[in-house]
Curated annotation (Swiss-Prot):
One Gene Ontology molecular-function label: hormone activity
Disulphide-bridged cysteine pairs: 35-44, 64-70
Position of the signal peptide: 1-17
Keyword annotations: Disulfide bond, Hormone, Secreted, Signal
InterPro entries, per the entry: RALF
Protein role: Cell signaling peptide that may regulate plant stress, growth, and development. Mediates a rapid alkalinization of extracellular space by mediating a transient increase in the cytoplasmic Ca(2+) concentration leading to a calcium-dependent signaling events through a cell surface receptor and a concomitant activation of some intracellular mitogen-activated protein kinases.
Protein name as annotated: Protein RALF-like 10
Protein family: Belongs to the plant rapid alkalinization factor (RALF) family.
GO cellular component terms given for this protein: apoplast
Localisation per UniProt entry: Secreted
Pfam families reported in the protein's UniProt record: RALF
GO biological process: calcium-mediated signaling; cell-cell signaling; regulation of growth
């Protein structure tokens, strides 16, 4: 009797699980792009900011400065 009930439960679970898996046939846009989600990872920019040129962290100057006291050619 127990084996029959267990077999029926397994069959019933398999019949119910098939339609649940076949409902979604496409991916959501939020799954594809991580930056579109509510909590974007570091490195994501707000919409429209990717076209702008990034600002440099520090300005590069070639050669020596007064403070380093290095020889000049």
């Amino acid at each position: 009797m127990k084996a029959l009930v267990i077999c029926l439960l397994v069959i019933f679970a398999a019949v119910i699980a098939v339609p649940v898996e076949s409902r979604r046939k496409h991916l959501d846009y939020g799954v594809i792009t991580k930056c579109a989600g509510p909590n974007p990872p570091p490195g994501c920019y707000p919409p429209g900011a990717q076209q702008k040129n990034p600002t440099p962290a520090n300005e590069y100057r070639r050669g020596c400065s007064k403070i380093t006291r290095c020889k000049r050619d």
